[in-house]
UniProtKB/Swiss-Prot annotation:
The lineage of its organism: Eukaryota, Metazoa, Chordata, Craniata, Vertebrata. Its cofactor is [2Fe-2S] cluster; [3Fe-4S] cluster; [4Fe-4S] cluster. Component of complex II composed of four subunits: the flavoprotein (FP) SDHA, iron-sulfur protein (IP) SDHB, and a cytochrome b560 composed of SDHC and SDHD. [3Fe-4S] cluster binds at residues 206, 253, 259. The gene is SDHB. The keyword Transport applies. It comes from Gallus gallus (Chicken). This is Succinate dehydrogenase [ubiquinone] iron-sulfur subunit, mitochondrial. [2Fe-2S] cluster binds at residues 103, 108, 111, 123. It is a peripheral membrane protein.
């Protein structure tokens, strides 16, 4: 009865008027369905082969030299991100391929690498659908390589540790007894700074850091230094500035701005460094007048 009201038979979607008239169902509909199914099957069967040229080097192999190795991946059977392709290659094509990865959602920074000429996160970088182009993947530039796509971040983390990235209070009598509260306005000053995930994409895209990586702290670390300098709960702003007075730690920045262009979180390390330089000028004036 319900089918009659709607005017459509529940059997194969045939209009009810044909059934009431005693007419046979139109077989053309079945033919159309068959054609559609065939087209879908043919489309699925057509492979979309994408080539990935990946940096390889294994220090545990005597005489092994850095080289590029090409892998082919069917994009119809792969997720949309470069990290999906790397995982597929490791799981199905070459288990020796080595890279870092963890969260797969742009939060941890583990999968930072150089993809198609730019530093970014493999988990948030979409695969270029142009099958005629080979996607080239390298470890982060100008860093020692542990193996394949794994850079040695020891110096980077040592520099981060050197800025003492935590709250420092001159009066610690209330430590552990109550919260150090902030106003909404003071808290908002930290926006665009605290979101840094320390992936090192910005620092390793900076020519100044390539040239003076042992002395220049680099954009990532300097942005974090600024984050603690302007935190209203911190009492060591002047001491933090004094730590950066030498010619290299801060002043090797020449506002090339590669750092801001490449940041996968959309942050602006170059602006943070400029703000530190402004604070440094005021600090030096105070020190000279004292």
């Amino acid at each position: 009865m319900a089918a009659a009201v709607v005017g459509v038979s529940l059997r194969r979607g045939v209009p009810a008027r044909f059934l009431r008239a005693g007419l046979r169902p139109v077989r053309g509909l079945e033919a159309v369905h068959g054609i559609c199914r065939g087209a879908q099957t043919a489309a699925a069967a057509t492979s979309r082969i994408k080539k990935f040229s990946i940096y390889r080097w294994d220090p545990d192999k005597p005489g092994d030299k850095p080289r590029m190795q090409t892998y082919e991946v069917d994009l119809n059977k792969c997720g949309p991100m470069v990290l999906d392709a790397l995982i597929k290659i490791k799981n199905e094509l070459d288990s020796t391929l080595t890279f870092r990865r963890s969260c797969r959602e742009g939060i941890c920074g583990s999968c930072a690498m150089n993809i198609a000429g730019g530093n970014t996160l493999a988990c948030t970088k979409k695969i270029d659908p142009d099958l005629s182009k080979t996607t080239k993947i390298y470890p982060l530039p100008h860093m020692y390589v542990v193996k394949d796509l794994v850079p040695d971040l020891s110096n980077f983390y040592a520099q981060y540790k050197s800025i003492e990235p935590y709250l420092k209070k001159k009066d610690e009598s209330k430590q552990g007894k109550e919260q150090y509260l902030q106003s909404i306005e003071d808290r908002q000053k930290l926006d665009g700074l605290y979101e840094c995930i320390l992936c090192a994409c910005c620092s390793t895209s900076c020519p100044s850091y390539w040239w003076n990586g042992d002395k220049y702290l680099g954009p990532a670390v300097l942005m974090q230094a600024y984050r603690w300098m302007i935190d209203s709960r911190d009492d060591y702003t002047e001491e933090r500035l004094a730590q950066l007075q030498d010619p290299f730690s801060l002043y090797r920045c020449h506002t090339i701005m590669n750092c801001t262009r490449t940041c996968p979180k959309g942050l602006n390390p170059g602006k943070a460094i400029a703000e530190i330089k402004k604070m440094m000028a005021t600090y030096k004036e105070k020190a000279a007048a004292a």
